[in-house]
Amino acid sequence: MASQTIRIRLKSYEHGILDESAAKIVATAKRTGAEISGPVPLPTERTLFTVLRSPHKNKDSREQFEMRTHKRLIDILNPTPKTVDSLMKLDLPSGVDIEIKL
């Protein structure tokens, strides 16, 4: 029988909240006896927006805004039923997007 792996991808605009959430997930999985691989920092996505400062003229005067999306990857190897239950009950901040694949 092949071993089961849970892959968790975390995304957030703020890296502090993201690292805190990853630490909570790792601590919960280790407490229940599962093996952990990660958190692995994935490349940061950078989206740049360029906007005219004035509403009608001055094409040379522009302002740039950027949005960074930080990502982390955590693999949980050989999870126990207790691990899955504790991960379901885990309370994480609202600014973190979580994607779980079995």
Swiss-Prot record:
One of its GO terms (cellular component) is ribonucleoprotein complex. Keywords: Ribonucleoprotein, Ribosomal protein. GO terms for biological process: translation. PROSITE patterns: RIBOSOMAL_S10. The keyword Ribosomal protein applies. The keyword Ribonucleoprotein applies. Involved in the binding of tRNA to the ribosomes. Part of the 30S ribosomal subunit. This is Small ribosomal subunit protein uS10.
